[in-house]
């Protein structure tokens, strides 16, 4: 009886239409339903860090789901704000600058590898670079090195000649 009362008050969530995404025997491969449900796989994949739309699509393709199912899952995740390439690109650029001391050229290259659109990359880089003191990052990165070594290290980390 308690279970029915609980279900009566449940709000609609992104999990409510799971039966729209059929899991066929070819996808099952002996695993439990939880591990073969495309929505569950996508949610577990984005659980630990933000992902680009392409990364999630690629993950679902590797799991063996058809394009129609992948499209439905991606649409649902975008509608619920769980996938947002603009937000992803900004956070990736900001973290790469502040935590990993990567320069704009390297960040741009890595985001292109993740199939983020060029205009989104440029906006994210502008925003991240405006919020970070790049000279401070360069100082930390090249502390105690002679001029030749500084220049080499800056190029390796993705800072161009203008720094």
List PLM regions with ranges.
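An alpha-helical, amphipathic repeat domain used for nucleic-acid recognition
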Residues: 1-163
């Amino acid at each position: 009886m308690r279970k029915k009362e609980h279900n009566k008050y449940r709000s609609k969530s992104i999990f409510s239409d799971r039966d729209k995404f059929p899991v066929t025997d070819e996808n099952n491969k002996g695993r439990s339903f939880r591990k073969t449900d495309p929505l569950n796989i996508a949610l577990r994949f984005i659980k630990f860090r933000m992902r680009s739309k392409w990364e999630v699509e690629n993950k679902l393709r590797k799991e063996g789901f058809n394009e129609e199912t992948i499209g439905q899952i991606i649409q649902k995740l975008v509608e619920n704000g769980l996938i947002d390439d603009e937000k992803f690109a900004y956070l990736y650029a900001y973290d790469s600058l502040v935590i990993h001391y990567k320069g704009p050229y390297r960040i741009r290259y890595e985001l292109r590898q993740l199939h983020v659109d060029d205009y989104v990359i440029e906006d994210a880089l502008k925003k991240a670079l405006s919020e970070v003191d790049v000279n401070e990052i360069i100082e930390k990165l090249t502390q105690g090195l002679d001029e030749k070594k500084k220049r080499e290290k800056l190029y390796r980390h993705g800072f161009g000649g203008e720094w």
